[in-house]
Amino acid sequence: MKLTCMMIVAVLFLTAWTVVTAVPHSNKRLANLYLKARHEMKNPEASNVDKRCFESWVACESPKRCCSHVCLFVCA
């Protein structure tokens, strides 16, 4: 019984701590995501969803943009 009560108190404390230490303006992040999504709906060229991966021997900046996921200044 004591262990159950201690667990309940611990969960309530951790929940309250999470709420108190949360970023105060996190709702602005959601608003920015909404505006970005709306802009992408109006301007489909701005969307990252339709962008395809790069083929071999194309200049790249990150491995996830290459079809092979290997980037050494060019897609391998």
Swiss-Prot record:
Disulfide-bonded cysteines: C53-C67, C60-C71, C66-C75
Subcellular location: Secreted
Entry keyword set: Cleavage on pair of basic residues, Disulfide bond, Knottin, Neurotoxin, Secreted, Signal, Toxin
GO molecular function: ion channel inhibitor activity; toxin activity
UniProt cross-references to Pfam families, sorted A to Z: Conotoxin
Tissue-level expression: Expressed by the venom duct.
Domain notes: The presence of a 'disulfide through disulfide knot' structurally defines this protein as a knottin. The cysteine framework is VI/VII (C-C-CC-C-C).
This protein's name: Conotoxin PnMKLT1-1111
Organism encoding this protein: Conus pennaceus (Feathered cone)
